[in-house]
A protein has these predicted regions:
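Feature for soluble, non-membrane regions of globular proteins
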Residues: 24-226
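Bacterial Sec-dependent N-terminal signal peptides
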Residues: 1-25
């Protein structure tokens, strides 16, 4: 087992034994470098910390069942393939079919949890705020466009704020397990618009979920990625 995986698992065990210890947010590089055997990354907050915007019950199913399921599936699919010693980033960029779908969903969900905070909401500051104002005219205009992308994505998928190779901001939407790393873009923010992200709390009311989502966005973390 690789050293980084041993350190990661030790951190998870520490959280289990001492619930008062909170996990640190993972950077994009830390998520990219995860390797077999994959583990369910610890949340950077308590299971009930996102209430009343996202309920503990939703996290128990979304994180504890769906996210864990993608981790389990990936661990079952990868052994014996060319991706047995690959990083999660390499799996996303080079694999197809079930390995890609489950690998990307492990990455996407880990990133999504790290985009949220019980102390989130508000607006970005600094260089990110300037870039948003330059590209979209105002934060409210950006928020409206990102929300529109999230609401108009047909079926299941993800909406993303990314930075392209030229450092320009872009809002994209990706069906199913789509991940912008495949196109050489840097993810800054994502919103999970699979129904399992909100059905227990909002049923099929995706707009209501988006309203709550904005109250949780960790703009400090998004700004650091930018």
């Amino acid at each position: 087992m690789k050293l980084r995986n041993i350190i990661f698992i030790a951190g998870v065990l520490l959280l289990v034994m001492n619930p008062d210890v909170k996990a640190q947010k993972l950077s994009i590089n830390q998520i990219n470098e995860l390797t077999m055997p994959f583990e369910l990354p610890a949340l950077p907050y308590a299971m009930d910390a996102l209430e009343p915007h996202i309920s503990q019950k939703t996290l128990e199913f979304h994180y504890g069942k769906h996210h864990q399921g993608y981790v389990n599936n990936l661990n079952n699919l990868v052994p014996g393939t060319e991706f047995e010693n690959a990083t999660l980033e390499e799996i996303i960029k080079k694999s197809e079919g079930g390995i890609f779908n489950n690998g990307a969903q492990v990455w996407n969900h880990t990133f999504y949890w790290n985009c949220l905070s019980p102390n989130g909401g508000g607006e970005p500051e600094g260089a990110l705020a300037e870039a948003i104002n330059k590209k979209y005219g105002s934060f409210e205009a950006f928020k409206e466009e990102f929300t529109k992308a999230s609401l108009t994505l047909f079926g299941s998928g993800w909406s993303w704020l990314v930075k392209d190779a030229n450092g320009e901001l872009e809002i994209i939407k990706a069906s199913n397990a789509g991940n912008p790393l495949r196109d050489g873009k840097t993810p800054l923010l994502t919103c999970d618009v699979w129904e399992h992200a909100y059905y227990l709390d909002r049923q099929n009311a995706r707009p209501a979920y988006l309203g709550e989502y904005w109250e949780l966005v960790d703009w400090k973390a998004v700004g650091e990625r930018f």
